A protein has these predicted regions:
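Generic alpha-helix detector with strongest preference for long hydrophobic helices that associate
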Residues: 1, 65-69, 109
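Negatively charged, low-complexity tracts enriched in Asp/Glu with abundant Ser/Thr
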Residues: 1-46, 106-108
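Intrinsically disordered, low-complexity regulatory segments enriched in Ser/Thr/Pro
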Residues: 49-78
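Generic detector of bulky aromatic hydrophobic side chains
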Residues: 18, 25-28, 69, 73, ...
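Generic N-terminal initiation segments characterized by hydrophobic and/or small/turn-forming residues
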Residues: 14-17, 51, 86
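Mixed-charge, Lys/Arg-enriched low-complexity segments
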Residues: 70-114
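Ribonuclease/tRNase effector modules and their secretory precursors
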Residues: 45, 57-60, 111-112
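Generic preference for hydrophobic/aromatic residues in regular secondary structure cores
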Residues: 40-42, 54-56, 62-66, 90, ...
């Protein structure tokens, strides 16, 4: 059994992160001063400057958003990991008719957008 399979067996919600990785997402672990993992951040860059971002603190504490080329939030969701990832995976690509484009607000300062 691989490390990924072992982790998913212990925490089935982690399969959702594997789904994102297979959809082209990149991830960055965030640690505290002692090297302990405090959260996981993920990003997927789109042509035209759009980007989707994910922050996971725990399986019940996650947030996702999409920003446009100006860093303005056009979609966001908070909740459990599965709920947020499902939202991100079903979100139409930015170039697709019906994709969110109406600005909801500015992205939080310090968000990692490639």
């Amino acid at each position: 059994m691989t490390a990924t399979n072992s982790a998913i067996a212990a925490f089935p919600e982690l399969q959702r992160l594997v789904d994102l990785r297979e959809a082209g997402w990149s991830f960055l672990p965030v640690t505290d001063d002692d090297g302990e993992l405090t959260e996981l951040r993920g990003v997927r860059a789109w042509p035209g400057g759009f980007a989707d971002a994910l922050r996971v603190v725990y399986t019940t504490d996650a947030a996702g958003l999409r920003v446009d080329h100006m860093g303005c939030v056009v979609w966001q969701r908070e909740g459990g990991l599965a709920e947020v990832v499902d939202g991100l995976l079903t979100l139409p690509g930015p170039e697709t008719v019906g994709a969110p484009r109406l600005v909801l607000g500015r992205s939080p300062s310090g968000i990692w957008v490639p």
